[in-house]
């Protein structure tokens, strides 16, 4: 969820140099199926937490951009790479009106709200844990509980707000571990034994394999019930009917992207891969598909439970909020209603033209490279 897949040093440098922009809406050519002319397009500025857009993670945005779903919903989607050097950038930019929708981790979201940045989650991309721990292949660690007293590599010291609650959930005092802020080389630190573990996440595993890094993993979904990165907006916008309508339409486009992906994962991967020139230099189509499938399965967590795409799970959030309050990451126990809402999520799931997305996916023509790829047996979302 956090990093790119060309040379990691290059990507992080690019992220640190500033928030690169990519104008998704300008790439569209689809007509105005819902009676909205191109002149009436409203911009939604979405900001990544990674400092790069060159990853397969955002397939649920690239598909509606390239298939014209956002445009037919009256939206020009602008994707902003953000900055990897400022852990709170994806909420700060929203609060400062430099972006409309952020993609913060739960730790960044709650730390931001606690510090007075008035944002709220309207969409939990994964209603469960997305983060993992990467280990050297010869590591004797077999359980995440064995991380007590170990060295854990991070890309930024700001990622501590992500890992601390995970450790508490495991019964580990965060003060017992040593964090190694290794910048762009944080995964290499684990691979080479300079750290005992490194923070990782679904979607990254296949990308690292594509770079030749040899690692094994403690998969977070097997032992954690905490939530993951969300789409968050300004609280003040949720009191504005026009903004609520705009963001609900944006989420309808996201739902269509997910339904398209579910119906034809290889087509979604081809669309996303084709949108990312730097990624194509270092990741072959099969590994790109594998990376996307790791995340696509996770993105379907709440959908598979019958709660629709993007559901904020109250129980998981309540447990998480208590842990971060006990840790002192927040000065007080944040009220659940200050952190999440499912109001837009429920409407978006009902109103999205899922049937069109599925039909488009089934007739989408694969190129020879993606026609040769294979979807992992048992994949579901």
Regions found by a protein language model. Name each.
Residues 10-33:
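N-terminal export signals
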Residues 67, 73, 93, 111-112, ...:
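Structured segments of extracytoplasmic/periplasmic soluble domains
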Residues 125-135, 209-240, 247, 251:
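Periplasmic-binding protein-like
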Residues 318-381:
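Conserved C-terminal helix/tail region of periplasmic/extracytoplasmic solute-binding proteins
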Residues 36-192, 196-202, 216-219, 223-225, ...:
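Short, glycine-/small- and polar/acidic-enriched structural segments
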Residues 241-333:
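Secondary-structure end/capping motifs
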Residues 178-181, 189-197, 208-217, 226, ...:
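A residue-level marker of the well-folded mature domains of exported/periplasmic proteins
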Residues 1-10:
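Secretory targeting signals
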């Amino acid at each position: 969820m956090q990093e790119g897949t060309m040379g990691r040093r290059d990507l992080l440098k690019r992220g640190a140099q500033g928030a690169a922009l990519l104008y998704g809406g300008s790439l569209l050519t689809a007509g105005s199926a819902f009676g909205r002319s191109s002149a009436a397009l409203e911009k939604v500025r979405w900001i990544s937490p990674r400092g790069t857009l060159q990853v397969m993670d955002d397939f649920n945005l690239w598909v509606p951009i390239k298939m014209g779903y956002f445009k037919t919903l009256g939206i020009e989607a602008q994707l902003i790479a953000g900055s990897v050097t400022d852990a709170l950038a994806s909420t700060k930019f929203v609060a400062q009106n430099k972006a409309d929708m952020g993609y913060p981790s739960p730790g960044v979201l709650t730390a931001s709200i606690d510090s007075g940045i008035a944002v709220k989650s309207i969409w939990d991309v994964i209603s469960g844990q997305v983060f993992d721990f990467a280990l050297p292949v010869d590591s004797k660690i077999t359980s995440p509980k064995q991380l007590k007293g170990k060295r854990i590599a991070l890309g930024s010291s700001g990622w501590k707000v992500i890992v601390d609650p995970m450790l508490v959930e495991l019964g580990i005092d965060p003060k017992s571990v040593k964090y190694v802020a290794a910048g762009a080389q944080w995964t290499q630190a684990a691979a080479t034994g300079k750290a005992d573990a490194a923070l990782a996440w679904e979607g990254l595993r296949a990308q690292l394999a594509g770079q030749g890094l040899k690692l094994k993993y403690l998969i977070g979904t097997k032992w954690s019930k905490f939530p993951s990165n969300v789409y968050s907006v300004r609280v003040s916008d949720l009191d504005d009917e026009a903004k609520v309508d705009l963001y609900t339409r944006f989420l309808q486009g996201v739902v269509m992207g997910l339904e398209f992906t579910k119906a034809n994962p290889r087509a979604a991967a081809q669309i996303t891969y084709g949108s990312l020139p730097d990624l194509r230099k270092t990741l072959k189509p099969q590994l790109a598909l594998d990376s996307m499938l790791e995340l696509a399965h996770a993105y379907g967590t709440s959908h598979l439970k019958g709660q629709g795409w993007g559901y904020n799970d109250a129980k998981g959030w309540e447990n998480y909020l208590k842990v971060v309050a006990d840790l002192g990451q927040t000065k007080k126990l944040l009220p659940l209603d200050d952190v999440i809402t499912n109001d837009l999520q429920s409407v978006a799931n009902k109103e999205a033209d899922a049937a069109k997305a599925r039909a488009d996916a089934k007739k989408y023509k694969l190129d020879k490279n993606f026609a040769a790829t294979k979807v992992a047996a048992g994949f579901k979302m």
